[in-house]
Regions:
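Charged, low-complexity intrinsically disordered regions
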Residues: 1-155
Length: 155
C-alpha cells in the first residue's frame, strides 16, 4: 500500500509524484454474514502506545492487554464479543503469526485482517525458497488467516 502525493515544482511548473510505501504485507476481508452490536479494532501495542498510555479497552487478560490495543465505541459489547476463549485463541495465533497484525471487526460483519510481514501474499522472494517451500509458506499463511477468521465465527 502506498501513499502518493502530487506537487507542482515552482521552478519548472511540472507536476511530480512522491510515492511512499506505508504498508507491505498480507490482508484479507471476510464477510461473516451477520451483524454485531459494535465494531472493534485490535492492533499491536508498541513503544509509543506504552509511553503515551493510549486509551484502550482492558480485557482483564494480562497477556492480551500487554500485547494489544483494543478500541470500540461500546466497551461492554466489545468485551462480550472478545470472550476469554476467543482472546486465548487470538494469543495462540499471535504466537504463530508471520508479522505484526491488526484485526477490525465491523458492525456489518466485515472482518478485516492485516499482517505486516514485509511481503505480499504470493511474493516468491528472490529465489530463496524452492517450489515446495513456497507452497508450504503460502499454505501456512492462508491457514493462519482462516484460523483467525474461525476465531471470530459464531460470535
Amino acid at each position: 500500500l502506498t501513499e502518493v502525493d502530487e506537487f507542482q515544482r515552482e521552478e519548472t511548473g511540472l507536476w511530480e509524484k512522491n510515492e511512499q510505501e506505508v504498508y507491505t504485507g498480507q490482508w484479507m476481508l471476510c464477510r461473516l454474514n451477520r451483524e454485531f452490536p459494535t465494531w472493534l479494532t485490535i492492533w499491536p501495542r508498541e513503544g509509543l502506545d506504552k509511553l503515551l498510555r493510549a486509551k484502550t479497552i482492558k480485557t482483564g487478560n494480562e497477556g492480551f492487554d500487554k500485547r494489544f490495543n483494543l478500541t470500540s465505541d461500546d466497551e461492554a459489547a466489545a468485551l462480550r464479543i472478545l470472550t476469554p476463549g476467543r482472546i486465548e485463541r487470538i494469543l495462540v495465533l499471535a504466537d504463530s503469526s508471520f508479522g505484526k497484525f491488526a484485526v477490525n471487526l465491523n458492525r456489518d460483519g466485515r472482518l478485516y485482517l492485516a499482517v505486516h510481514s514485509g511481503r505480499g501474499f504470493f511474493d516468491a522472494g528472490k529465489g530463496r525458497e524452492n517450489p515446495a517451500q513456497l507452497r508450504e509458506r503460502f499454505a501456512r499463511e492462508l491457514r493462519w488467516f482462516t484460523d483467525m477468521i474461525d476465531a471470530f465465527r459464531g460470535v
